[in-house]
């Protein structure tokens, strides 16, 4: 086998096996891109934005990437959903959320398991419900250590 063939085989194989964690990093980056708009809305209005439009960001289906299907803002919670195909099987259709809570006149952001906030005027979040009682959360083994918060995070 020539050097070229070895390099070609290596590239061909490695392209197929992009680790789930690398794919999840795209979701985190896209979700984090919405944080400043959500924070600004809260600081100006005293409540969390109800949706992407009120936050002043693109529609959920327009915030997407190679592995991410959509990024939704709902009552200040930013949730990224992975695509149902073309991604690592362990994260297909799974979600992660970023959310903030008020802290001394500012906001503190959290990242981790998917959550929901029922009231835009409240900081309380709960674990998101999903199919069959599962919340479609990305397994923590695929999340960086800085993005493993749960709804009870303080």
Residue ranges and their predicted role:
Residues 1-39:
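Amphipathic alpha-helical segments typified by the pilin-like N-terminal helix
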Residues 43-154:
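Periplasmic/extracellular, small/polar-rich flexible segments of pilin-like filament-forming proteins
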């Amino acid at each position: 086998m020539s050097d070229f063939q070895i390099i070609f085989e290596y590239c061909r194989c490695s392209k197929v096996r992009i680790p789930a964690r690398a794919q999840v990093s795209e979701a985190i980056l896209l979700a984090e891109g919405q944080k400043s708009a959500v924070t600004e809305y809260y600081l100006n209005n005293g409540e969390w934005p109800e949706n992407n439009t009120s936050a002043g960001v693109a529609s959920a289906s327009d915030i997407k990437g190679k592995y991410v299907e959509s990024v939704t803002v709902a009552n200040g919670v930013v949730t990224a959903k992975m695509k149902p195909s073309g991604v690592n099987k362990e994260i297909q259709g799974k979600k992660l959320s970023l959310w903030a809570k008020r802290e001394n006149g500012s906001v503190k952001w959290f990242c981790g398991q998917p959550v929901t906030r029922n009231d835009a005027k409240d900081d309380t979040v709960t674990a998101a419900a999903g199919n069959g009682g599962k919340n479609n959360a990305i397994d923590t083994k695929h999340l960086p250590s800085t993005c493993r918060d749960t709804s009870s995070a303080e």
